């Protein structure tokens, strides 16, 4: 049974374009299915998480990451008697707007778009789901519920300054109440993302031999996990050890998140969803001690993994590809597919740049590499 402060699909604020309710799926389940059936969702399997898609078969990509985030989000929401369907749906959609080549690709495209209001993967997710996906005759996008769109846009908190151009424009026709917090389910999806990526980036980095267990000792709490596991399992292999460490890490993070969130619910005496939105802080959270551990782990990953020689070398190649493609399309729009070229408003430079950015952002790693090799 859903809590009184949960997002109830029967009380959804609805869709921009009204539709007849489905007889066997609730509104958030319908949204989940719509997202899964988008072209953008399928392309995630060929988009970088940390390691380039062709670097190895077992490294995570944007699709596997999104599935892992959705699993964590669903479990946490279920335990708190919140809408697991909504939490899962937001989690599945949270990375749809990412460029090829992960954050290196996004930084490169944002630099290309510096004179055209920049590029944001979060805003791009909204744009994909409300404009760029063409699956219905009656409208652009996939016509998701207000709650899902709110969660995608505001899962990291209220947006009160430097509002992205597309988010601001869309908000005029469908007010997402940008100055408030999103639902508890959206907040869960955001922290499920943190739990998943710090855990699994550690795992993948060990597998790629970018870091080892000696360097992991810099994280004292992780070193304690390693010591306890080696003491319990004398002959444990390195490959099994990292799986056990990640399992322990995820369990402790999820347990901590549940405890602190329940404390906040009780402290604030929350009875309905609007009270969550109007709080002056994020309701769903970790304890202060765990937040410090997460910050420490993110710093470790940034210094030891994302700035490592291997990842830096790959990032430089990816930057060259994205910037090269942007330049070649800006120089000659006839190189764009006809259906994309038709979206440009009379060859006006701002419109041209935005359409090109949308096109490049939608590419998979391998498609971008192929296009670069053909055109640059």
From Swiss-Prot:
Write out the coiled-coil annotation as residue ranges.
none
**Would you say which domain of life the source belongs to?**
Bacteria
One BP term from GO: dGTP catabolic process
Q: Which Gene3D superfamilies does the entry mention?
A: Hypothetical protein af1432
Under Gene Ontology molecular function, one entry of this record is: dGTPase activity
Check the record and name the SMART domains matching this protein: HDc (SM00471)
Q: Which InterPro entries match?
A: dGTPase, dGTPase-like, dNTPase_2, HD/PDEase_dom, HD_domain, PHydrolase_assoc_dom
| HD domain residues | 62-198
Do you know which SUPFAM superfamilies this protein is assigned to?
HD-domain/PDEase-like (SSF109604)
Key words, A-Z? Hydrolase
Under PROSITE patterns, the record lists:
HD (PS51831)
Similarity field: Belongs to the dGTPase family. Type 2 subfamily.
UniProt protein name: Deoxyguanosinetriphosphate triphosphohydrolase-like protein
